[in-house]
C-alpha cells in the first residue's frame, strides 16, 4: 500500500550561476549561488505544486549547507531525514550558460558531504507513507551514498512504492564512461519509471532511435519510459501505449533543473490521480499525453528564469 509522499535521495548542492551568458568560465566575473542538485530539485518541483516530498541526503555543516536546508524547507520539503556532517563540505557546481540557455558544469565534489550518507542512516519505516522514491546517477559513484541508495530502493520496493530513476549523466564525476554506463544499467532494472533524455539515449543503449532502444530500457521492473527531447517535446512509453506532447516555444535563459522539473511535475500528477505502481502499465495514450503536456508547460515556465528551484512555478502560476 503506497502513501502520498515523494522521497528523493541523492545530492543537494549549490549551483553557481554566472553573471554573463554565452561566454567561457574565465570570462565570467561573478556567480550567484542557487540551491540545486537533481534529487533536491525534484522534491522542490513536487512540493511547489502542493505535493508532500521528503529529501534523504547529507550536507556539510557549513554556510552553503545551511543555505540549502533553509531554502528546501521554505519550499515545504520534509527535511527530517537530512543530516549534516563536518567530515566534508557541501558540493558546488559552477555553471556556464550558452546564449540559448544550455549549460556545462564544473564540479567541486571530491568527496562532498552527500557522498558520506550511509545505508545505516536509512530507516525502512520511513517508506510507510512513500508514494515514490526518486534517484539519479550522480551519487552512485563508489561511496557510502551508493549503498544508501540500495537500502532506500529496497525499502521503497518492499513498501509497494514507485521507484523512479533519472540517470542525469554527469561524465566529469566518474572515473570513466564505462563505469558510469555499467552502473546505470545495474540500477535500471530496479526502477519502475525511467526518465531519459535524447542526449543520454545513445550513450546508454548504442542507438539514437528511441523505438529501437525500448527493448533495452524495458528491463526488470521498468513499466514507464519518459523520453525528453528538449524543445522538441517529450514522449512517454508503456509496453502497450505511446504518448507525445510538443513544447510551446519560449525564450530559454537557463535550462538548469528543467529535466528535474519535468519528472517532479510528472510524478506529482501520478500521485494526484492515485496512480500506484501496479497501475503504471495501464496508463492510456490520452492520459500520457495529458501528463506530458503539463510537465512541458512546467518546464517552459522554468527555463525562462535563472536557477532551478527558484524558477519552478506553483500550481496557481500554471493556470
Question: Where do the PLM segments sit?
Answer:
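Conserved N-terminal subdomain of the carbohydrate kinase-like
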Residues: 52-135
Amino acid at each position: 500500500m503506497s502513501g502520498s509522499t515523494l522521497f528523493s535521495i541523492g545530492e543537494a548542492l549549490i549551483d553557481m550561476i554566472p553573471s554573463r551568458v554565452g561566454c567561457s568560465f574565465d570570462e565570467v566575473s561573478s556567480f550567484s549561488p542557487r540551491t540545486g542538485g537533481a534529487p533536491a530539485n525534484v522534491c522542490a518541483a513536487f512540493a511547489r505544486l502542493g505535493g508532500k516530498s521528503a529529501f534523504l541526503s547529507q550536507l556539510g555543516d557549513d554556510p552553503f549547507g545551511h543555505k540549502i536546508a533553509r531554502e528546501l524547507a521554505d519550499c515545504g520539503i520534509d527535511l527530517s531525514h537530512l543530516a549534516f556532517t563536518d567530515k566534508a563540505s557541501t558540493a558546488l557546481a559552477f555553471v556556464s550558460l550558452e546564449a540559448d540557455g544550455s549549460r556545462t558544469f564544473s564540479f567541486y565534489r571530491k568527496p562532498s558531504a552527500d557522498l558520506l550518507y550511509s545505508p545505516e542512516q536509512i530507516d525502512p519505516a520511513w517508506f510507510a507513507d512513500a508514494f515514490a522514491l526518486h534517484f539519479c546517477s550522480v551519487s552512485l559513484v563508489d561511496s557510502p551514498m551508493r549503498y544508501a541508495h540500495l537500502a532506500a530502493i529496497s525499502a521503497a520496493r518492499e513498501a509497494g512504492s514507485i521507484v523512479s530513476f533519472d540517470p542525469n549523466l554527469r561524465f566529469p564525476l566518474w572515473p570513466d564512461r564505462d563505469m558510469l554506463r555499467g552502473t546505470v544499467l545495474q540500477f535500471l532494472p530496479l526502477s519502475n519509471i525511467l526518465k531519459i533524455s535524447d542526449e543520454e539515449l545513445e550513450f546508454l543503449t548504442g542507438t539514437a532511435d528511441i523505438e529501437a532502444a525500448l527493448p533495452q530500457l524495458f528491463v526488470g521492473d521498468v513499466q514507464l519510459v519518459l523520453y525528453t527531447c528538449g524543445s522538441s517535446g517529450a514522449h512517454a512509453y508503456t509496453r502497450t501505449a505511446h504518448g507525445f506532447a510538443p513544447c510551446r516555444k519560449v525564450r530559454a535563459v537557463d535550462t538548469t533543473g528543467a529535466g528535474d522539473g519535468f519528472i517532479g511535475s510528472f510524478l506529482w500528477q501520478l500521485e494526484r490521480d492515485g496512480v500506484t505502481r501496479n497501475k503504471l502499465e495501464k496508463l492510456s495514450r490520452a492520459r500520457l499525453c495529458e501528463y506530458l503536456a503539463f510537465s512541458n508547460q512546467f518546464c517552459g515556465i522554468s527555463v525562462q528564469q535563472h536557477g532551478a528551484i527558484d524558477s519552478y512555478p506553483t500550481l496557481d502560476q500554471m493556470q
